[in-house]
From Swiss-Prot:
InterPro entries: Flagellar_operon_YvyF. It comes from the Bacteria. May be involved in the assembly, structure, or function of the flagellum. May polymerize to form a filamentous structure that is part of the flagellum. This is Uncharacterized protein YvyF. Keywords: Bacterial flagellum biogenesis. GO terms for biological process: bacterial-type flagellum organization. To S.typhimurium FliF.
Length: 139
């Protein structure tokens, strides 16, 4: 179930869910903006447009266009000059959430953490295998 929240755009009260992050009025406004961008990009001569040109020509905010791309409502496969920023470093990318450099860095960090965990487990297991014998008799 959702929770009661204020719309981040217009501050109206609405029921926020994972899928609905703005109020109904703002959803309708976003849909109008999407239609505007979609109609612009359907024209063959506009498919070479960059993000800044689309913003300039349609009047739709860059962040909203990026939201449509992230939601995969705008497919960029046939739009060669359109890209969106990596969520970690901001480099322009055309697929996924992270650029190749960030993917590699995250993988290296995960490998390092997994290696540390393996060493910690190995150390704990070696303590379990150690037996101590105490001689209580004094010979």
């Amino acid at each position: 179930m959702g929770e009661l929240a204020n719309c981040p755009k217009c501050n109206a009260l609405f029921l926020k869910t994972k899928l609905q992050t703005v109020c109904q009025a703002c959803i309708k406004e976003e849909e109008k903006s999407f239609e505007t961008v979609y109609k612009f990009l359907r024209k063959q001569e506009n498919r070479q447009s960059t993000l800044s040109r689309i913003t300039e020509e349609t009047g739709v905010e860059e962040e909203l266009i990026l939201k449509f791309i992230r939601q995969k409502r705008i497919q960029i496969t046939h739009l060669p000059n359109l890209a969106y920023p990596c969520e970690r470093c901001g480099t322009s990318i055309r697929e996924g959430k992270f650029c190749k450099a960030c993917q590699s860095d995250i993988k290296d960090q995960m490998d390092h953490l997994n290696h540390e965990d393996a060493l910690k487990i190995e150390k704990e297991n070696s303590k379990k295998d150690t037996y101590y014998a105490y001689n209580t008799k004094n010979s």
